[in-house]
Amino acid sequence: MLELDLQLASDGQHPDEAQLRRWCELALRQRTADSELTIRLVDEEEGRELNRTWRHKDYATNVLSFPAEIPDGILDIPLLGDLVICVPVLEREAAEQGKTLEAHWAHLVIHGCLHLLGYDHIEEDEALEMEELERQLLAELGHPDPYAGDE
């Protein structure tokens, strides 16, 4: 079971909670434990402030992942972590990259959830593993390869 806390702090258009939940559940299906996570949708000002505070980068980014560092078993429902999605950045990227909003939303939610599971893309081999998993999950949803233009 996934307990999802959706926080809306942006006026931008966004998928409904059921759609966000579907993408999260797909990305998290390898996890057998119940999970709780928060998705906070923010504007550029808050996105920039969070990115500056936590990553020391002075710009708004598309998605930030904050994994919980609480061992399973302490809480009734294991807290997986928080995703912060900057809606204006997501919308701008989708337009610039020629992607549908739905496909880009799905990609960033899945990407963020994989980070909460411990996947990363700092080292090339880890990036290849994470990107391949993203491709597979998005293909299940009928969305194209989000990295097709990067090669």
From Swiss-Prot:
**Superkingdom, taxonomy of origin:** Bacteria
The UniProt annotation places Zn(2+) binding at: H111, H115, H121
Q: What are its cofactors? A: Zn(2+)
* PROSITE patterns referenced in this protein's UniProt entry, alphabetically: UPF0054
Can you quote a single GO CC term?
cytoplasm
Q: Which InterPro entries match?
A: MetalPrtase_cat_dom_sf_prd (IPR023091), YbeY (IPR002036), YbeY_CS (IPR020549)
Q: Which UniProt keywords apply?
A: Cytoplasm, Endonuclease, Hydrolase, Metal-binding, Nuclease, Ribosome biogenesis, rRNA processing, Zinc
Q: What is its main location?
A: cytoplasm
Q: Which GO terms describe its molecular function?
A: metalloendopeptidase activity; RNA endonuclease activity; zinc ion binding
- Annotated EC: 3.1.-.-
Q: Which GO terms describe its biological process?
A: rRNA processing
| Cofactor: binding details | Binds 1 zinc ion.
Localization:
Cytoplasm
Query: What is this protein's function per UniProt?
Result: Single strand-specific metallo-endoribonuclease involved in late-stage 70S ribosome quality control and in maturation of the 3' terminus of the 16S rRNA.
Family the UniProt entry places it in: Belongs to the endoribonuclease YbeY family.
PANTHER family recorded: ENDORIBONUCLEASE YBEY, CHLOROPLASTIC
According to UniProt, the name of this protein is: Endoribonuclease YbeY
